[in-house]
Amino acid sequence: MDSFFDVSSEDIRQLDDAALRELVGRLCEAEYRNEGRDTAGVLWGGHQDASDGGLDVVVRSGEGLASSQYLFRANVGFQVKKPQMQPAKIRGEIVKNGGLRPQIQELAEQSGAYIIVSSGDDCSEPALKNRIEQMRKSVGSTKHADRLFMGFIDCSRLATWVRGHPGIILWVKTRIGRSFKGWRPFDRWAYVPKGGEDRYLLDDHVRVFAV
């Protein structure tokens, strides 16, 4: 039986491209929300295959989160991939026409962070170091390259991040068809017929309904 508040690397692997990107966006929002910070600077959405300069989730804030492993810089860009991102593939994601992709160059100028997320990878420590080293080589001696933090998140490390946010664990389980009976994530639970009025009814009382 599944542990209620647990998620595995295999669970992460089962998410499709769009859900994977949404997961990273939700995690960034949750990190900021936990610190009482505005989530307006967490930008994600649109079509997964849209021409977005290589970044799928972008975080722009006045100040990073000192307590966060991935969001400690004020400007962070995530490139989210479902397939494996072997070292040989990395350069093509960072460099275009002999130079850094514009959004990655902008992150370097802002002393930001560029992070690749790959649910297809489950890296040992040496394999993780190889991928980050290839990222550094791809950036090379480009202007402001020394200001840019680079990171790589595989499926195991992404699962670890998710475990810190129980509500997102339930969201992942629902997306892969393994939701728990009697539990659903924040969502529209009531059926509203087409053309019907869809609004919350508020008063000054607290009610608990057993189902």
PLM-predicted stretches and their roles:
Residues 1-210:
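Mixed-charge (Asp/Glu-Lys/Arg
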